């Protein structure tokens, strides 16, 4: 039975990062801690045959798309902090909207990319990312893509629809970005899970694809209002703020005249007018999945990944931007 | 004891082959003579070396990587990197410098400079110092640093300066540490804020500040402005001040304390405190701005889109970022002949809708 560093860390009661520092003789480790780790190694019979080496100094890119959502920034920050604890250098270029920053990072020596975007970026370096739960993407030829976690958008949509349907809404619209894999998947799940999908209506009329912007949101929500929607699900926080503003300008009241559900929580969602009901994501779980996959890819941890990446289903955080539909 | 340390200095061939997804024989040939294997295999092996951090470390890999591609896979020699150092922000807290860091990052990448992001944590600073400067362990070389904010980042800046790394700090407190700095002077902003609130008719104005090294200057500035503008003795009673720890909950506690003191307007000196104020107002069923006017010194995320849009005293981050980038590049280029810079930046008042004349109370 091979002894892993995780077991050594657990036995010594220290973190994995500390064990790798002791092994690599890098960074500051208190003498007492060092002794504890070495003792744990000899007790467990740790041998040098595992793949870990002296944690060379490497640069890793941790990236969110341009104009990122709050959850994407949060996940990136947590991942960056964890990688830094393993003595890796972190660079955070924006991706998706502009290829240049990532290219600069790769030229500077980035050996892997960790990203919260769902769009396949076709990088030459390994790309550790998130995907939609049921998305069947072909694994790129070079085998550089690692799916660390899957988002259950279908489940998230169902949750939102169930919430809105329970309070009497049928005419539910979707405001989403005009580009990006997340928007594509949201639309797919929207069409598949919509409560009115079997009523012979053209659901496309209730989908508004607009840029990820404030003005996009205001425009889209009024379009959907004119298409007689009584509730909308909004992909991006900027669009959500725009939608609330657009409705206010038209002297319409949220939630009386239009119920609004956002995607992704942030501290400001409590203070929108009115506080927004949102589908919240498990930021910590997502971050941990990305961190584990990254450490695995860089051969820092050797515990082995789950053969199926963990699935995260967004959860509804009910505030006051949704209410019963008026008959 | 130390000679029995299970240290690992070399990457094994099996490991390289495993990571690259080629056979050991192919890996071996690719390392010795890249011409003898297909271009694809050679690229895979080069990449595996980079992932394992072994580029240029294994004796025979050196020639292999260099010959294979002129661009050089992984080692990143030659390209310059600048570190962007910030104090780590605990989960759930609001980062007052997120906007500035974003602008700095995007501008530097725009100039083709790769940015290395460091989150300073007091108890990890020693290790971070080694990671930042330890290019002899492989990986890229960092040629300078922009340090934003104080706390652990300030301490790390001092350690890096001692080791001779070109540095520029952007911070809201002034220390005699001999490091070049752009000083964000909030006292002018606080004076503007007080003047604005007094002009609206407020007399009981409270100040909420974070308990950090910038607090004394801010409190003194506030008291001086109150005394000068309202012609009152700026005592604890007449010009109430609450010092709070970080985090939204501390903001709520500070807000409740100031509301107890019957303040009709509050100047919050950090975004977390502003969110605390909004939260406290919500809990007490007070309406901002009708029952309580709120001015923030600093950057509240989404300030323009929350309800009500928040009036702020903010810095021109784009200019601050550009100056910092220009200065650090000049300092790196100048080497030992670099000149010390010390700017002071005053903020501007951005009026939105969170401060109105006092209504009742």
Task: Give the ranges of each region predicted by the language model.
Chain A
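N-terminal helix-turn-helix DNA-binding module of bacterial transcription factors
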Residues: 1-56, 326
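Alpha-helical recognition/docking segments in bacterial nutrient-uptake
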Residues: 57-162
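Short beta-strand elements in bilobed, periplasmic/extracellular small-molecule ligand-binding domains
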Residues: 83-95, 173-174, 189, 193-215
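An alpha-beta-alpha
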Residues: 158-199, 304-322
């Amino acid at each position: 039975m091979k002894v892993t560093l995780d077991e050594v860390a657990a036995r010594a009661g220290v973190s994995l990062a500390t064990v790798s520092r002791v092994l690599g003789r890098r960074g500051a480790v208190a003498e007492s801690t060092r002794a504890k780790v070495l003792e744990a190694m000899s007790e467990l019979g740790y041998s040098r045959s595992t793949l870990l080496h002296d944690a060379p100094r490497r640069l890793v890119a941790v990236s969110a798309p341009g104009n990122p959502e709050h959850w994407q920034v949060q996940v990136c920050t947590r991942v960056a902090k964890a990688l830094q604890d393993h003595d890796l250098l972190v660079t955070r270029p924006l991706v998706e909207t502009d290829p240049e920053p990532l290219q600069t990072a790769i030229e500077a020596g980035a050996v892997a990319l960790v990203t919260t975007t769902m769009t396949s970026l076709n990088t030459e370096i390994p790309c550790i990312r998130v995907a939609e739960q049921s998305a069947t993407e072909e694994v790129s030829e070079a085998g550089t893509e690692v799916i660390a976690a899957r988002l259950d958008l279908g489940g998230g949509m169902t949750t939102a629809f169930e919430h809105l349907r329970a309070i009497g809404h049928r005419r539910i619209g979707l405001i989403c970005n005009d580009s990006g894999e997340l928007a594509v998947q949201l639309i797919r799940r929207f069409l598949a899970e919509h409560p009115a999908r079997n009523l012979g209506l053209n659901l496309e009329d209730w989908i508004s694809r607009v840029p990820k912007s404030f003005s996009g949101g205001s425009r889209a929500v009024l379009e959907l209002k004119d298409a007689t929607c009584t509730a909308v699900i909004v992909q991006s926080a900027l669009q959500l703020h725009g939608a609330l503003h657009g409705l206010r300008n038209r002297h319409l009241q949220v939630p009386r005249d239009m119920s609004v559900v956002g995607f992704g929580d942030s501290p400001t969602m409590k203070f929108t007018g009115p506080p927004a009901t949102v589908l919240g994501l498990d930021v910590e779980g997502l971050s941990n999945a990305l961190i584990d996959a990254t450490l695995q890819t860089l051969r820092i941890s050797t515990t082995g990944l789950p053969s199926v990446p963990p699935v995260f289903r967004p959860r509804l955080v009910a505030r006051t931007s949704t209410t019963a539909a008026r008959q | 004891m130390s000679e029995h340390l299970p240290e690992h200095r070399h990457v094994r061939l099996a490991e390289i082959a495993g990571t690259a997804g080629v056979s050991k024989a192919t890996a071996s040939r690719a390392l010795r003579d890249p011409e003898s294997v297909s271009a694809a295999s050679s690229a895979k092996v080069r990449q595996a070396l980079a992932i394992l951090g072994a580029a240029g470390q294994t004796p025979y890999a050196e020639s292999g990587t260099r010959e294979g591609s002129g661009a050089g896979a992984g080692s990143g020699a030659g390209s310059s990197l600048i570190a962007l150092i910030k104090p780590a922000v605990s989960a759930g807290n609001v980062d007052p410098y997120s906007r500035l860091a974003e602008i700095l990052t995007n501008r530097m990448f725009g100039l083709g400079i790769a940015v290395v992001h460091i989150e300073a944590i007091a108890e990890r600073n020693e290790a971070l110092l080694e990671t930042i400067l330890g290019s002899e362990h492989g990986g890229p070389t960092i040629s300078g640093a922009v340090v934003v904010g104080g706390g652990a980042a300030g301490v790390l800046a001092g350690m890096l300066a001692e080791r001779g790394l070109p540095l520029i700090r952007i911070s809201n407190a002034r220390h005699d540490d001999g490091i070049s700095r752009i000083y964000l002077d909030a006292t002018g902003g606080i004076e503007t804020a007080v003047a604005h609130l007094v002009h609206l008719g407020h007399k009981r104005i409270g100040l909420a500040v974070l308990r950090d090294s910038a607090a004394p200057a801010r409190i003194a500035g506030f008291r001086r402005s109150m005394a000068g503008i309202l012609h009152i003795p700026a005592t604890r009673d007449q010009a109430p001040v609450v010092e709070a720890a970080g985090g939204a909950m501390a903001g709520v506690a500070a807000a409740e304390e100031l509301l107890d003191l019957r303040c009709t307007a509050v100047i919050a000196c950090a975004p977390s405190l502003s969110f605390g104020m909004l939260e406290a107002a919500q809990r007490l069923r007070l309406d901002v701005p009708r029952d309580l006017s709120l001015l923030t010194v600093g950057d509240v995320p989404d300030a323009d889109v929350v309800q009500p849009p928040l009036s702020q005293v903010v810095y021109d981050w784009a200019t601050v970022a550009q100056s910092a980038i220009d200065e650090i590049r000049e300092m790196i280029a100048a080497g030992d002949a670099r000149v010390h810079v010390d700017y002071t930046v005053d903020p501007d008042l951005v009026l939105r809708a969170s401060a109105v004349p006092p209504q009742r109370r």
